Amino acid sequence: MPSIADKPTVLARACWLAAVGRAELRDEPLPAPGPDEVQVRALHSAVSRGTEGLVFRGEVPASEYGRMRAPFQTGDFPAPLKYGYASVGVVELGPPALRGREVFCLHPHQTRYVVPADAVLPLPPGVPAARAVLAANLETAVNALWDARPGVGDRIAVVGGGVVGLLVAWLAARLP
């Protein structure tokens, strides 16, 4: 009779910053999801050129380590660590209402992962998974506009044509 020890180990491949300026892929065993957890198979993962560039180059100031920590980061700055916060995937295991759903999660770059079920956000109908990875950047753009507090009819100049700058411009163009 098979025992739980006979169950094959599920492996994930994760991107680790092994040392400042050097990334590597590592195989990691996944824990079985608990009753309030999901196992997600990643479809897309976005790299934040600005933030993750700072992390890769070891340029995160020690005073900012706490604020720069990603929700499911493993390891500590400057390295070794597993970093990232823009993953879209499909729930493979977990509560029936989430199984098979495409979801967004603030998770590092990894092929599969287990997180609390309330850490994933199901994608709205019609939102392509490849675009949904921009959710973290869109949140930054929304916060920038909230902080700027534009009024009706204000002219807004966006300096910077990166992903966040383009999203700020896109949102600003839709303001009254």
Regions found by a protein language model. Name each.
Residues P8-A14:
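Short structural boundary motif marking the start of a folded domain
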Residues A18-G21, G34:
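Residue-level recognition of beta-strand termini and adjacent short loop/turns
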Residues G21-P29:
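Short glycine/threonine/proline-enriched tight-turn/helix- or strand-capping micro-motif at secondary-structure
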Residues F104-A117:
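A structural motif shared across PLP-dependent enzymes of the aminotransferase-like
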Residues R131-P176:
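Mid-domain Rossmann-like dinucleotide-binding core that forms the NAD(H)/NADP(H) cofactor-binding site
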